[in-house]
Amino acid sequence: TPSQCTAAQANKCCTGLTNGILNLNVLPALNP
């Protein structure tokens, strides 16, 4: 159903944003 598709897209987007934030927080720590 469209609602499930929307939920899947939202989850994918949310995961991408979370990974992006984690990368922004982790990468500077890895680069002295």
UniProtKB/Swiss-Prot annotation:
Keywords: Allergen, IgE-binding protein, IgG-binding protein
The name this protein goes by in its record: Allergen Asp fl 1
Domain of life: Eukaryota
Coiled coil found in the keyword field: no
Signal peptide: none
MF-aspect GO terms: IgE binding; IgG binding
Entry annotated with the keyword NAD: no
